Amino acid sequence: MRIELKAIGLVRTNAQKLPRHWSVSDVEGTLVIDEEYLEGLRDIEAGQRIVVIFHFHRSPAFSPEMLLQTSGQSGKEMGVFSICSPVRPNPIGISVLEVLGTRGANIDVRRLDMLDGTPILDIKPHIEEMPG
């Protein structure tokens, strides 16, 4: 099965060093969304958390020998699906970001763990617990 995804925008940040995970990040930047998706940004507000799905565009091509990798956190060899490595069969990442504000098709955020130029695939609201 072939699946095609289209970027809806990209990340802009001046940060040179990034933490390995959004949960320990104070890095700020901007999600620059393509104008054709502007209407879809309605109701995103400062103080809200959003889930950003992105493409690890600088990761090397995946091969079977990468199924086991050394965890950056524990130093142990672990299965790729049990760690947060950017080297994956499908180079897709997920981060929960704090919205600082919006300006047209730009969303200013904090907690970035993405490089400048990272393609954004989707944005969803962060919902702690579904009502009902």
Regions from the PLM with identified roles:
Residues M1-G132:
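Glycine-rich, low-complexity intrinsically disordered segments
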